Amino acid sequence: MKLSLLFLLFTWANVTIAQDIRIISDFESASIGSLKQVAPNEFKGQTMHWIKYDQIGNQYYWFYFKVINVKNKIASFELDNLKGVYRGGPHICFTDYTQPVISYDNESWARIEDVSYDEDKKIFRFSTYFEHDTAWIAYAHPYPYSRYMNYLESVKSSPYLNIIEEGRTPENRSIPLLEITNPGKKKDKKSILISAMQHSGEDAGGYSAEGIINFLLSDNIEAQKIRDEYVYYIVPVMNPDGVFHGVSRYTPKMQDLNDEWVREDTDEMDSPMEVEFLKNWIIDRYKNNNSIDLFIDIHCHLQRNLNIAFLDRSKETEALKELTELMRNYWPHVRYGHRYSPARLAVNFTAELNIPSLVVEFTQAYESDGDGNYLTIDDYRQFGEDMVKSITSFLNE
């Protein structure tokens, strides 16, 4: 009798433990502030809030965690305090059409559709049914640094791709600068420079950079002609340390790389290594009379229903409106706007080096064409390919 009772107690205890949902965030690019169980299969908490070193920024949107012991369960998650600070003003990222992503292998992702957002209280809720025991959940499709390194390894044998420069981060991660062209063709080619993921958490930019690279290296007839006539320089991941640690927007030193291209005498911190790497490369090019004909900086941190191409207010960039119009042929919801800050990468390149520069910010989630489609990794890659086609049409005019 005693043995039977002990056996029943042991079995009950193990079943109870097995049913407890576990939240894990100790892997690459993962991030969640606090997430506590408040009822069976119900969790409440906050995302990490990252405070900029000068205290005028508070970024919070990125989350990425793993759940275990969830098979055949419905679990709900509530995140509050979803309000930050951007350049001294309020920053709101979440909406009622924000849809996180879920994966059972950390590779293939689907949207979580059961979502709600309380705009007054800044609370975001979502719930989902789990088909397997382990799942990963993220704000948007993650693009970890290791994935980028593996991708680069898979394409670097191409005769058209060359790593011409390699910057380093404070944590000694590589920042490859890629050159893509046909080296056997003419030398006086127009040069295009593209950067992505200055801001960690803007992971769709990494996939769009893959789309650019995949197309330029392909056997497509148009791609072959582009390689003959142009040379592309691409930095797919400008902020590897921030990406690795799952930071929203900033580096682990809480610097916004896009605010660091012009330094003031009163700045308390040194210019980031990530910035100095690319800046020095461009300055060296100009010293050797090698210009850049076009620069594009890719951003994508919000899940909102529009894509914007930002220009500064200088006359030199007004012509780039034509490029945004060409992008409409592929992405009808692209529009252009204006922003000005001398410390921004694109603005600095225009003002200091007279490089025609464009900031392209596209959504990580919802398309605004009225059909309610949500973007996928393939869509991000297609965006990159279509951008190259738009650039070619623009420079050929």
Language model features with spans:
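Sec-dependent N-terminal signal peptides
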Residues: 3-13
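Extended acidic/polar, glycine-enriched regions
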Residues: 115-160, 164-167
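Active-site-adjacent mobile loop/cap segments within catalytic or ligand-binding domains
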Residues: 142, 256-258, 304-311, 339-397
